[in-house]
């Protein structure tokens, strides 16, 4: 079994829960998690339970959100730290829901993974 398959199998329940709650295709969420976290093996995923590379905003920090400091695009960037992988999946979904640039995606059906991936790319998802 490939590392991608192992990741998808291990975290499928989290992705399915997010699909039920928010309508985001589980396959899209898993694909983003696979890419962003190197199949859950990145330092950010291992140390901070952050599977989507979500950066800690000033609002996150002001509300008491924990963060780790890593070099990504620039040195010493702040990334959200979560108590669990499930919290990371939930924050990823809320990030998409609360960001107006992704609104068009939410007009699509949860089984329209192609439309979702195109919509996310057009909206500028990194």
Spell out what each predicted region is:
Residues 1-126:
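Catalytic cores of secreted/periplasmic lytic hydrolases that degrade extracellular macromolecules
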